[in-house]
C-alpha cells in the first residue's frame, strides 16, 4: 500500500487535448474536515488506510493542495435532458484531477466534485453542498456492496464555506472514482457539433482504453456498442430487481462503462410502487421507477446516433434490439434468485409479476419482504408475511404457487435455500430517511452517524449486532420522499 505522495499518475484523458477538456485548478473550500472515507474505495488507488487520517488527505480533497503529477481538467459534453437536447453541458463543478495507475494494472479516475467554477458552470457557483455529497458517497458504496455496478466514492470533505441553494448550506467536496468519466453525452457533443475528427479520437480512446478486446472483432465499434448495450441491460436489471430509482437518467448521466453514475435525487423503494418518482422536478414521471427500462433503451438509441459515422444504422438497430430480451433474462434470473429458486421454469415470469402486483396493491415493503421470506422455512415465512397483504385470497393463491414452484427445485434443504436467499436479499439498504438523519447530524458537525450508516451499508446482506434500527420500515414521514436536484 502507498502513501499519498506515492500514487502513480497516468493521465490518458488529459493527453487527448483541449478539445475534450479544459485545464482548471480547484477552488479550495475553507476549514476542511473529513466527514467519511471508504477504505475499500481508496484501496483501489493502493492507498494505505491510515492515509485518510492525515491532515494532508483533507487538504488535497478540499482543493488546497495538489499532486505535481495531477492535471485537473473539466470535461466537455452535451446530452439529452428529459428528452430534449442540450448542446453544451460539461463539468460545471467537478474536475478530473488525473488517472491513478494501481498495482493491479488498472487506471482509476480521481474526480473531485464541488471543486469550484469551470467554463461549463453556466452561472453556477461550482460548489456541491454537504447533503448531496453525503448522499452520493453512501449511494455509491451501498450499490457496490449490493453488487450493482457503480462509480465509487473515496471520501467527503466538509467546510465552513457558505453556499446558497433554497437556504444557506455548507460547501463540501466528494471524491468520485471510476475507470472512465466518459458519458453518452461526451460522444453526442462531438457528433452534434460536427467535429468528426474529435469524435473519432474519443471513440478510439474509449475502444482502446476500455473495450480493448473488441479490437479483435471484425467490426470493433459495433462489438463495443453491443457490449455497452449488454452492460446497460444487466445494470438496469439490477436496479429494478433491487428497487433502485436513479431519478435523472439524462444521457449526460449515462456512463460509457455501463455503471451507475452521477447521483442526484435517487431513492430505493420503500413500499413497492412501480410508478414511484423520486425526483420532485420530474413532473411527467419520465424517470419513474417503471420507466427506467424504456428510458435506458432510449438513451442507447441516442448514443447510437452519435456512433453512426462508424457503424451502419441497421447494425445499430439490431444491437439496440438486444437490450430488452437481455434485460428480461437478467431481471428474471435476479428475481428467481431473490425467491430462492435456482432452476428456470416457464411459470417464473408469471410468479414474479403476480407477486409484484400484490405488493403494489398492498404497499408491502419491497426489501423486507424478500429478506423475511428467507428468514424461515417457506411455509412459516409465508404465514408470517400473509398479514402484510390486503388481498389475502390473492396472496394465498400466490403462496400456494410459490410452494409448488419450490417443490420443483429438488435442490438442497430448506436451510440451504434460506442461506442462498440471505446472500442476495439485503437486510439494510440506503433508505432516504436514514440518509436524512445522518445528513442532519453532519450539518451540525457530528459525523458519527454518517460513518455508522456507511459501515452498516458496507455489508448489507449480513445481520449486524445492535443495528436492527437500520433494518426497519421507515416512519410515515420517511416514505416516498421526493428529492430535489439542487445539490
From Swiss-Prot:
Please name the catalytic residues of this protein. 252
Question: Which InterPro entries has this protein been placed in?
Answer: SelO
Q: Which domain of life is it from?
A: Bacteria
Give residues annotated as binding Mg(2+): 253, 262
Arranged from A to Z, the UniProt key words for this protein are: ATP-binding, Magnesium, Manganese, Metal-binding, Nucleotide-binding, Nucleotidyltransferase, Transferase
Q: Which reaction does it catalyse?
A: L-seryl-[protein] + ATP = 3-O-(5'-adenylyl)-L-seryl-[protein] + diphosphate; L-threonyl-[protein] + ATP = 3-O-(5'-adenylyl)-L-threonyl-[protein] + diphosphate; L-tyrosyl-[protein] + ATP = O-(5'-adenylyl)-L-tyrosyl-[protein] + diphosphate; L-histidyl-[protein] + UTP = N(tele)-(5'-uridylyl)-L-histidyl-[protein] + diphosphate
For activity, the cofactor(s) needed are: Mg(2+); Mn(2+)
Q: What is its EC number?
A: 2.7.7.-, 2.7.7.108
Instruction: Output the Gene Ontology terms for molecular function.
Output: AMPylase activity; ATP binding; magnesium ion binding
The reply on keyword Transferase is: yes
List residues binding ATP: 90, 92-93, 113, 125-126, 176, 183, 262
Q: Does the keyword Transport apply?
A: no
Tell me, what does this protein do in biology?
Answer: Nucleotidyltransferase involved in the post-translational modification of proteins. It can catalyze the addition of adenosine monophosphate (AMP) or uridine monophosphate (UMP) to a protein, resulting in modifications known as AMPylation and UMPylation.
Which family is this protein grouped under? Belongs to the SELO family.
Would you tell me the protein name for this molecule? Protein nucleotidyltransferase YdiU
- Which gene is this protein's source? ydiU
Amino acid at each position: 500500500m502507498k502513501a499519498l505522495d506515492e500514487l502513480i499518475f497516468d493521465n490518458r484523458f488529459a493527453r487527448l487535448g483541449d478539445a475534450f477538456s479544459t485545464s482548471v485548478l480547484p477552488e479550495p473550500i475553507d476549514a476542511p474536515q473529513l466527514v467519511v472515507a471508504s477504505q475499500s474505495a481508496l484501496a483501489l488507488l493502493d492507498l494505505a488506510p491510515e492515509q485518510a487520517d492525515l491532515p494532508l488527505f483533507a487538504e488535497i480533497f478540499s482543493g488546497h493542495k495538489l499532486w505535481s503529477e495531477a492535471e485537473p481538467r473539466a470535461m466537455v459534453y452535451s446530452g439529452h435532458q428529459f428528452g430534449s437536447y442540450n448542446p453544451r453541458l460539461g463539468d460545471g463543478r467537478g474536475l478530473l484531477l488525473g488517472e491513478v495507475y494501481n498495482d493491479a494494472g488498472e487506471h482509476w479516475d480521481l474526480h473531485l466534485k464541488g471543486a469550484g467554477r469551470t467554463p461549463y458552470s453556466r452561472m453556477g457557483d461550482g460548489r456541491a453542498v454537504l447533503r448531496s455529497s453525503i448522499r452520493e458517497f453512501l449511494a455509491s458504496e451501498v450499490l457496490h456492496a449490493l453488487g450493482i455496478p457503480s462509480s465509487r466514492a473515496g471520501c467527503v470533505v466538509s467546510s465552513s464555506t457558505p453556499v446558497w441553494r433554497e437556504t444557506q448550506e455548507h460547501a463540501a467536496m466528494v471524491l468520485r472514482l471510476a475507470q472512465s468519466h466518459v458519458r453518452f453525452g461526451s460522444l453526442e457533443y462531438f457528433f452534434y457539433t460536427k467535429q468528426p475528427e474529435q469524435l473519432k479520437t474519443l471513440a478510439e480512446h474509449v475502444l482502446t482504453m476500455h473495450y480493448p478486446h473488441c479490437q479483435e472483432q471484425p467490426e470493433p465499434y459495433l462489438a463495443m456498442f453491443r457490449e455497452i448495450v449488454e452492460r446497460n441491460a444487466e445494470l438496469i436489471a439490477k436496479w429494478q430487481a433491487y428497487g433502485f430509482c436513479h431519478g435523472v437518467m439524462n444521457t449526460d448521466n449515462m456512463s460509457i462503462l455501463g455503471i451507475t453514475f452521477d447521483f442526484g435525487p435517487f431513492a430505493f423503494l420503500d413500499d413497492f410502487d412501480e410508478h414511484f418518482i423520486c425526483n420532485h422536478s420530474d413532473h411527467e414521471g419520465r424517470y419513474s421507477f417503471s420507466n427506467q427500462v424504456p428510458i435506458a433503451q432510449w438513451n442507447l438509441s441516442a448514443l447510437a446516433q452519435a456512433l453512426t459515422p462508424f457503424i451502419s444504422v441497421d447494425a445499430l438497430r439490431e444491437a439496440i434490439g438486444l437490450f430488452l430480451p437481455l434485460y428480461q433474462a437478467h431481471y428474471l434470473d435476479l428475481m428467481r434468485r431473490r425467491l430462492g429458486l435456482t432452476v428456470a421454469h416457464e411459470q417464473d415470469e408469471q410468479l414474479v409479476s403476480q407477486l409484484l402486483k400484490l405488493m403494489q396493491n398492498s404497499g408491502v415493503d419491497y426489501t423486507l419482504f424478500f429478506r423475511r421470506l428467507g428468514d424461515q422455512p417457506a411455509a412459516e415465512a409465508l404465514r408470517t408475511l400473509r398479514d402484510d397483504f390486503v388481498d389475502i385470497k390473492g396472496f394465498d393463491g400466490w403462496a400456494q404457487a410459490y410452494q409448488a414452484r419450490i417443490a420443483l427445485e429438488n435442490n438442497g434443504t430448506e436451510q440451504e435455500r434460506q442461506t442462498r436467499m440471505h446472500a442476495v436479499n439485503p437486510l439494510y439498504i440506503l433508505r432516504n430517511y436514514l440518509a436524512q438523519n445522518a445528513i442532519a447530524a453532519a450539518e451540525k458537525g457530528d459525523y458519527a452517524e454518517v460513518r455508522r450508516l456507511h459501515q452498516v451499508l458496507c455489508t448489507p446482506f449480513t445481520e449486524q449486532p445492535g443495528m436492527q434500527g437500520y433494518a426497519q420500515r421507515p416512519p410515515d414521514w420517511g416514505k416516498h420522499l421526493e428529492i430535489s436536484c439542487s445539490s
